């Protein structure tokens, strides 16, 4: 939950609204006001603005070197978008397995009861079956939202990469 909240806050602070930002930057840039374009980038202070600022900062380089600088900055910024995605993926894949482990231990408990009491008393089996169902449900209740959150965060990251490619490279 902490990872999801942190990612929500990050994406809220860094919306992928590159069109409005780029319109302002291009206006200043093509008017020859490079300093104003840089000020717009600094005031925006988003990952896309940082990539564009890196390019403006290195206008004296040749085209290929300028693109390299922007690619390097884009890679730094993409890492900000991808932060904790591996952890979310791990949580999403492991929690159903932990639930399955609980299912197995619950069934083992049920069979242990059968071996000692016999099958005549269904209430004796209920504890093991209940354990199996609760742990399965718990694993799914954590795993499914984690998978949804991971996919959403991954989509936001891809959206950012596409914006960088469209506007800067």
Feature annotation, model-predicted:
Residues 1-20:
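Hydrophobic membrane-targeting segments
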Residues 2-5, 91, 95-101, 138-142:
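Lipid-exposed faces of alpha-helical membrane segments in multi-pass integral membrane proteins
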Residues 14-101, 105-119, 148-169:
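Predominantly long cytosolic amphipathic alpha-helical stalk/bundle segments
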Residues 123-150, 154:
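Pore-lining and gate-forming transmembrane alpha-helices of multi-pass membrane transport proteins
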């Amino acid at each position: 939950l902490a990872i999801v909240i942190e990612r929500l806050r990050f994406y809220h602070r860094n919306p992928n609204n590159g069109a409005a930002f780029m319109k302002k930057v291009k206006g200043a840039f093509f008017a020859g006001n490079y300093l104003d374009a840089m000020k717009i980038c600094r005031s925006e202070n988003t990952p896309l603005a940082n990539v564009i600022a890196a390019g403006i900062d290195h206008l004296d380089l040749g085209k290929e070197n300028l693109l390299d600088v922007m690619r390097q900055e884009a890679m730094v910024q993409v890492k900000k978008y991808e932060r904790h995605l591996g952890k979310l993926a791990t949580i999403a894949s492991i929690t159903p397995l932990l639930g399955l482990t609980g299912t197995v231990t619950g069934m083992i408990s049920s069979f242990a009861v059968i071996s000692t009491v016999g099958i005549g008393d269904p209430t004796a089996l209920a504890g093991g079956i209940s354990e199996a169902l609760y742990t399965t449900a718990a694993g799914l209740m954590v795993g499914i939202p984690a998978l949804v959150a991971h996919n959403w965060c991954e989509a936001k990251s891809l959206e950012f990469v596409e914006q960088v490619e469209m506007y800067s490279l």
